[in-house]
Amino acid sequence: MTNIEDKDWSRSEGDSWDIVSSVGFTALGVAAARAVENREADPLVRDPYAEHFVRAAGEPHLIGLLDSSEPKPPNPGTAPRHIGLRSKFFDEFFINATNSGCKQAVILAAGLDVRAHRLPWPAGTKVFELDQPQVLEFKDRVLAEHDATPTSDRREIAVDLRDDWPAALLAAGFDPEVPTAWSAEGLIIYLPSAAQDLLFERVVALSAPGSQVAVEATRGRPDIAKWGEMQKKYADEGHPMSKVDITTLFYDEERADVAEWLAARGWKVQGSHALELAAAYGVEIPELPEDVVEVVKQGNYVTAVLPS
């Protein structure tokens, strides 16, 4: 078994990772959260493969989380069912976008989500999944072991999003003349500010009129020190997130506000934080401590449409 306490959690220029190290571990943690969400009486997301990924990775803390009689979400210090809310937001985005004219979808930093397999895509929809080579290799191996069949024309692109991913995307059959649904979920905080700017410049350059974007972002510069304090405060002994400081993976830099950046380039933008999503989805959230509410409201789930 691989143990997260034995990993190096520092970042460096051009760093890479597998599914149980660095940024890759966050994808595994999110898969664990989706597996926990699956057990809700009325789950916000149904992901039949999430638990398979966690068990195949062999990370003992996350496996213990799933085997607990009362599993806790892997992200203490956030709104309860946060990953369920986040997953539903992006699920609904893709369903609505592809049913309103987007013929292809690009999932930037796809991680271990299996939207290409579990969403009801319109016939012929191309779904491009971009992520680190070792992450996609692990994902494909587990999916093959469980005879998973995509509900879309799935195309995996093993590439670092700090490199020339547009060339790889075009080589895989992406058509920049066709409206596209783009997503950046759990991504931009792990990018340097300059890399974030370049990412969205490339998205805009590749987007035909009618394209849509969904982004997990923040309102203003996130207080990463505060996030670290919250993690320590609410992760009890034995919780996976008590073993590592996930904020060491973030880039604490001044960066463009994604919603404002897209709006300045002619996109029609909307945004919500997780508590607003919960209200929209009819999810009752218990009263939260003030410091948790403050952090949750820093989040911004952005959707943007490029007018035709």
UniProtKB/Swiss-Prot annotation:
Any single Pfam family the record assigns to this protein: LCM
Keyword match Ubl conjugation: no
Enzyme Commission code: 2.1.1.-
InterPro entries hit by this protein: Ppm1/Ppm2/Tcmp, SAM-dependent_MTases_sf, SAM_mthyl_Trfase_ML2640-like
Function in brief: Exhibits S-adenosyl-L-methionine-dependent methyltransferase activity.
Similarity remark: Belongs to the UPF0677 family.
Name this protein carries in UniProt: Putative S-adenosyl-L-methionine-dependent methyltransferase MAB_4584c
Lineage of the organism: Bacteria, Bacillati, Actinomycetota, Actinomycetes, Mycobacteriales
